[in-house]
């Protein structure tokens, strides 16, 4: 991996899909979403530009899912089922990358994660992206 804090190696659980993600703004874009799909998936995501994911292996092992408007495309390993990334609905020129797939990181490394209002998505309401809360991780003593 390149010695750049914004470039992160990643993979799915079984290792069939391996990639390198160049984060758009480091971890400043970290978030959770309240849309019906993300609520069930429970992932923490961070942004990468559309050309910011380079597959090292297994791109052909990815499968995808779309719902509702069909504008966001969610990618998964067809072997282990892990969500690796998605094309964002709010910005089609960006990917959301699953933080849990990034080497050496865990969603629990982030003590506070902004939660964005996906139930009232800006593309539906015409309004700005709205933060509806904060997901907090409090370490046990």
Task: Describe the predicted segments one by one.
Residues 1-11, 16-141:
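A short Gly-Trp-Pro
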